[in-house]
């Protein structure tokens, strides 16, 4: 069997090597992202145009028909009666 000390040394060396590779990769990635942000121009949003005027809808009435009011009132009364039981 091999010595446990040599296994720990090998494990530590592998860990440090892996952490070093990740550190170098992330450093290069940050450098490239900063370089790209300087080279590529920012997007300019399209100019805001004035909204189109909405035509006045005179055809529609703003009142509710009495049948609709009666139906809604009956439904509310029925619901309240069923909840109260």
Swiss-Prot record:
Its EC number is 7.2.4.2. Keywords: Cell membrane, Ion transport, Membrane, Sodium, Sodium transport, Translocase, Transmembrane, Transmembrane helix, Transport. Its main location: membrane. It catalyses: oxaloacetate + 2 Na(+)(in) + H(+) = pyruvate + 2 Na(+)(out) + CO2. GO terms for biological process: sodium ion export across plasma membrane. GO terms for cellular component: plasma membrane. It is found in: Cell membrane. One of its GO terms (molecular function) is decarboxylation-driven active transmembrane transporter activity. It is an enzyme of class 7 (translocase). InterPro entries: Na_pump_deCOase, OadG. The keyword Chaperone does not apply. Its cofactor is Na(+). It is a single-pass membrane protein. Heterotrimer of an alpha, a beta and a gamma subunit. Catalyzes the decarboxylation of oxaloacetate coupled to Na(+) translocation. Belongs to the OadG family. NCBIfam families: oadG_fam, PRK03814.1. This is Probable oxaloacetate decarboxylase gamma chain. The lineage of its organism: Bacteria, Pseudomonadati, Pseudomonadota, Gammaproteobacteria, Vibrionales. The gene is oadG.
